[in-house]
Amino acid sequence: MIYGIGTDIIHIPRIEQLINKYSTKFINRILGKNEITIYQSLSIKQQTNFVAKRFAGKESVAKAIGTGITSSLLLPDIEILNNNLGKPIVYIPNAAKILLNNKKLTEYKIDISLSDDHPLAIAFTVISAST
């Protein structure tokens, strides 16, 4: 059964402006520790697209959970990493797992798709669950 869906689209130049203006402070508000390590290994152009897709992805995950970004579910808490084939995998904090468990979801799967085509990045998330 589909528990929730979420989508988000972002204007990449907006992210670029925020990175240029706030630098590390902005990155730390968006990315988790593992994502920051990946971010630092990328070229400047790749960094901007990486952050834009992660921002859209995290927003779409929060929408699919049904809470949006809250004090108990912050952007850096959600990490989107890639497996060895490049597929994005969502890692959520215990607070989000508790949220889903409180909604009587014993088993769930989070699928996410990320894409960018300058000047836009988009993410789509589906949470499927068995009750």
Curated annotation (Swiss-Prot):
It is found in: Cytoplasm. Its main location: cytoplasm. SUPFAM superfamilies: 4'-phosphopantetheinyl transferase. It catalyses: apo-[ACP] + CoA = holo-[ACP] + adenosine 3',5'-bisphosphate + H(+). GO terms for molecular function: holo-[acyl-carrier-protein] synthase activity; magnesium ion binding. Its EC number is 2.7.8.7. InterPro entries: 4-PPantetheinyl_Trfase_dom, 4-PPantetheinyl_Trfase_dom_sf, ACPS, Ppantetheine-prot_Trfase_dom. It comes from the Bacteria. Mg(2+) binds at residues 8, 59. Gene3D superfamilies: 4'-phosphopantetheinyl transferase domain. One of its GO terms (biological process) is fatty acid biosynthetic process. Its cofactor is Mg(2+). Belongs to the P-Pant transferase superfamily. AcpS family. Transfers the 4'-phosphopantetheine moiety from coenzyme A to a Ser of acyl-carrier-protein. This is Holo-[acyl-carrier-protein] synthase. The gene is acpS.
